[in-house]
Amino acid sequence: MIVSKSTNLSSSVSSWRRGKSTFFKTRTTTGNFSSSSKSSKISLNRRRSSRYKNTIKMENFESKPKPEGAPECTVYYTPELVSKAIAELTAESARSAIEERGYFALGLAGGSLIKMLSGLKKDTNEENKIEWEKWHVFWVDERCVPLDDPESNFGGAYETLFKDVPIPRENLHAIDDGLYEANEGASAKSAEAYDKELKSLSETILPKGDGGLPIFDLLLLGFGPDGHICSLFPNHSLVKVNDARWILPIADSPKPPPERITFSMPVVNMAKRKVFAAVGEGKAEMAKHILEDANKTDGSIPAAMVKDAEWLFDTTGSSKLTTTHVRFEFPGTPTLLGLDTKEED
């Protein structure tokens, strides 16, 4: 993990204490860092806790700017702080898009990401009040099941967030679950219908870019333990599809249910902002692989093919990173934009 500072730090920075354990302590502004070396002045220590395992102790670091072209990676102390950051960046993206053209186009994955947006329900700031009626929400993939099925990404998002906010139902762009009576054969019909619906929207709602591809303001993406995104799975033929279709059918998903629809990779990459969240120990190994080891073009790890993505981690989610440049955002400490990973002689 490489980190570098954005501000001048004093020779001694007060520790932010969580319980009795010192989380963050800086003694000097020069030195070396290696997350794997025993001789390092900075170490990532795993400690047993009923609520959280990892703490980070930092001493003696050397400033290093983010390399050109490196992904934006930010580490937060807890999952709750990652959730807060996700909600804030979503609200920020919405305000920017609405100011620019009057609408906000958001693409969502399923899983835990939608829970991170629940803080938006509490936004009562009148000055920056969320204009829900100007939001248009889409799903980057969907299972071909009824919308009230527990497996439905739309259903999960609606129950978790959208039923409690004043967003018009017609602005929630779900698949038409009336197109099929059984799962078999549903993906082709559903993908065609969803593709047609999205292409019929005005460019004020969903702008178009190169090749007529849609430009979503923000995609909130998850990734699986195999590195899949949306319903684009490793080494599947759909990963490299590059034609006029925005929405693709998949009838042989390696994860049940087999019938799904998904954004194509070109549609994902055309979005203005693409954001991944890697929270928890279960995400750490694959996040490292995506950012540091994976082939970016062969389709073996689809998440590695997403260009110019932003990454948000908690400390456990980032614990396997070794060469990735990261920025630390911790309450009670200066903002850090990375440290050099040179080992001591």
Task: Give the location of each predicted region.
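N-terminal chloroplast transit peptides
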Residues: M1-K41
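N-terminal organelle-targeting presequences
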Residues: T28-P65, E72, D345
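N-terminal glycine-/serine-/threonine-rich phosphate-binding loop
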Residues: K57-L106, A188
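Ligand-binding beta-strand-loop-alpha-helix segment within the catalytic cores
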Residues: N60-A70, K129-D217, P331-D340, E344
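Glycine-rich N-terminal segment of FAD-binding domains in flavoprotein oxidoreductases
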Residues: I98-E127
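Glycine-rich beta-strand-to-loop/alpha-helix junction loops that act as flexible
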Residues: L108-L113, L221-P225, V279
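Class I SAM-dependent methyltransferase SAM-binding "motif I" and its flanking Rossmann-like core
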Residues: L219-P266
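ATP/nucleoside-binding phosphotransfer catalytic cores, i.e., glycine-rich phosphate-binding loops
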Residues: P266, M270-D345
